[in-house]
């Protein structure tokens, strides 16, 4: 036994015991690093109350926060992806699907629901980015078309929240075909004169941005959302030049006229309802009642990991 081990064995120092904090009660802001109470963050729709950073939000949480309580009906839930090409990169596609389905609880990357928004019938779709980066495959395209068909049947507006890395490479040309398929479906909305509002969230890239995500009668973005086709790193490597600060972010795009407006997530529900009421010649909606306040307990030690 070394001299230091003998000294340590004689010491009466007892290790500090961390507080017994349940898993998931606290989290950290992706931007400012502030320790946040999970319940308060959920109440604030995954927007940091300290720096206003808009974190990524699950598809079902988006739709539940948008549509009136008790009005939601899911569409296209029976559609499931198939590994038609028997595709394999470093891992089999069917195994990637199984992992994504287990981790997210979703069958694919797009969730579609119909319901009411301040009493007005609407159809809404939202991407689940945690499902293979929100990539667009055959099921995503089919569900989006189902959303359009339902909006046409109900003679109501369509809203889509995009959060995607683009077309799903594991489905090759079948995924690229969804760009044309979804765009053609939206042409029917235009013929009928029904509003389609596209909400661009972080990130909206690739084949999704090159198709239905940018085809809204109104294209609304969340603050600081990354929106484009190729990513900034790929562009820099290609052109061999440093890109401007904030390139491809929503604030940059609105300056260039590529999008129509930027709306903070907590204000989005009322903003969408107000716009659609105007477009559908309906009475203006009243503001929602304030959400019930959350009592935030003392912040734990900074070295505690949620």
UniProtKB/Swiss-Prot annotation:
Top enzyme category: transferase
The protein's required cofactors: Zn(2+)
Family matches, as InterPro entries: AcCoA_carboxyl_beta, Acetyl_CoA_COase_Trfase_b_su, ClpP/crotonase-like_dom_sf, COA_CT_N, Znf-ACC
Organism: Cronobacter sakazakii (strain ATCC BAA-894)
Role description: Component of the acetyl coenzyme A carboxylase (ACC) complex. Biotin carboxylase (BC) catalyzes the carboxylation of biotin on its carrier protein (BCCP) and then the CO(2) group is transferred by the transcarboxylase to acetyl-CoA to form malonyl-CoA.
Location of the CoA carboxyltransferase N-terminal domain: 25-294
Pathway: Lipid metabolism; malonyl-CoA biosynthesis; malonyl-CoA from acetyl-CoA: step 1/1
Assembly notes: Acetyl-CoA carboxylase is a heterohexamer composed of biotin carboxyl carrier protein (AccB), biotin carboxylase (AccC) and two subunits each of ACCase subunit alpha (AccA) and ACCase subunit beta (AccD).
One annotated Gene Ontology cellular component of this protein: acetate CoA-transferase complex
Superkingdom classification of source: Bacteria
Catalytic activity, EC: 2.1.3.15
Designated name of the protein: Acetyl-coenzyme A carboxylase carboxyl transferase subunit beta
ZnF segments: C4-type: 29-51
Keyword list, A-Z: ATP-binding, Cytoplasm, Fatty acid biosynthesis, Fatty acid metabolism, Lipid biosynthesis, Lipid metabolism, Metal-binding, Nucleotide-binding, Transferase, Zinc, Zinc-finger
A Pfam family annotated for this UniProt entry: Zn_ribbon_ACC
Family designation: Belongs to the AccD/PCCB family.
Location within or outside the cell: Cytoplasm
UniProt region (Disordered), positions on chain: 286-306
PROSITE patterns, per database record: COA_CT_NTER
């Amino acid at each position: 036994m070394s001299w230091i081990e003998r000294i340590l064995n004689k010491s009466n120092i007892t290790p500090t015991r961390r507080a017994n904090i349940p898993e998931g009660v606290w989290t950290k802001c992706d931007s400012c690093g502030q320790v946040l109470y999970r319940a308060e963050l959920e109440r604030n729709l995954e927007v940091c109350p300290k720096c206003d950073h808009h974190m990524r939000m699950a598809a079902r949480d988006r739709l539940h926060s948008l549509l009136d309580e008790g009005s939601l009906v899911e569409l296209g839930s029976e559609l499931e992806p198939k590994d038609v090409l028997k595709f394999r990169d470093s891992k089999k596609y069917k195994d990637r699907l199984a992992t994504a389905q287990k981790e997210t609880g979703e069958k694919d990357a797009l969730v579609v629901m119909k319901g009411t928004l301040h009493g007005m019938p609407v159809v809404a779709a939202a991407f689940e980015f945690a499902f293979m980066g929100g990539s667009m495959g055959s099921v995503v395209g089919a569900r989006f078309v189902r959303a359009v068909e339902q909006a046409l049947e109900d003679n109501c507006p369509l809203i889509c929240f995009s959060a995607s890395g683009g077309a799903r490479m594991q489905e090759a040309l079948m995924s690229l075909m969804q760009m044309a398929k979804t765009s053609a479906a939206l042409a029917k909305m235009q013929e009928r004169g029904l509003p389609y509002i596209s909400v661009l969230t972080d990130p909206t890239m690739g084949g999704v941005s090159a198709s239905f995500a940018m085809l809204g009668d109104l294209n609304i973005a969340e603050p600081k959302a990354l929106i484009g086709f190729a990513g900034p790193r790929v562009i820099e490597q290609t052109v061999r030049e440093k890109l401007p600060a904030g390139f491809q972010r929503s604030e940059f795009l609105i300056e260039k006229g590529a999008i129509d407006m930027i709306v903070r997530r907590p204000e989005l529900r009322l903003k969408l309802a107000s716009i659609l009421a105007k477009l559908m010649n309906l009475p203006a909606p009243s503001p929602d009642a304030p959400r019930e306040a959350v009592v935030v307990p003392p912040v734990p030690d900074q070295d505690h990991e949620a």
